[in-house]
Amino acid sequence: MNNELNTKHYQALRRAFDTAWPGPIGQPILLEKGHLRLQVFPRDGARITSLQAFGFEVLRQWEPQRKAFQYGCFPMVPWAGRLGDATLTVGEKQYALPANKPPHALHGMACYSSWESVEHKADTLKLRMPLGAPWPWQGEVLQTLTLEDDALILRLEIHTMSETFPASAGWHPWFVKQLGQQNEEDELLVCFKANW
């Protein structure tokens, strides 16, 4: 996919879902609109590391004791969830994928890939990631993050470069358990409207 996959941290992640993690990699990109503020690290799997709404941090933050998957919000592409025995079966063919939660493969490959920024405005960011080995097909993934006055709109697109292939996509958010101080009764409304 890219040279980012050859670093020791990403190699470890491909072998063990719960590997120790050095924290966000590369430079962050910030988006702001109204009472919303978003921070994304393209080189850290296009992970949203911070989402602040009306002064409250909504996402779980990285700390030294965190494992690779345990903070922020990252895209799961080209598969979401678990592939049993790290095997993708398509028709009569079987494809082996990295078993990062042996014996299974979890959450795709996007979370340990470096993404490229292809468009950046004050309230919008579009990122691109090529798809390739160890995924058996060639393609690309586009992720668009847009802040509106009272919402974060996320979009993932998967494009093939030649033959069609099966794929799935989604996000893995780690929300904080408590907004603000323990004695405050502020509530967070999360509204998911899937478009499929």
Q: Predicted regions span which residues?
A:
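Surface-exposed acidic/polar loop and edge beta-strand patches at domain peripheries
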Residues: 2-155, 164-169, 173-196
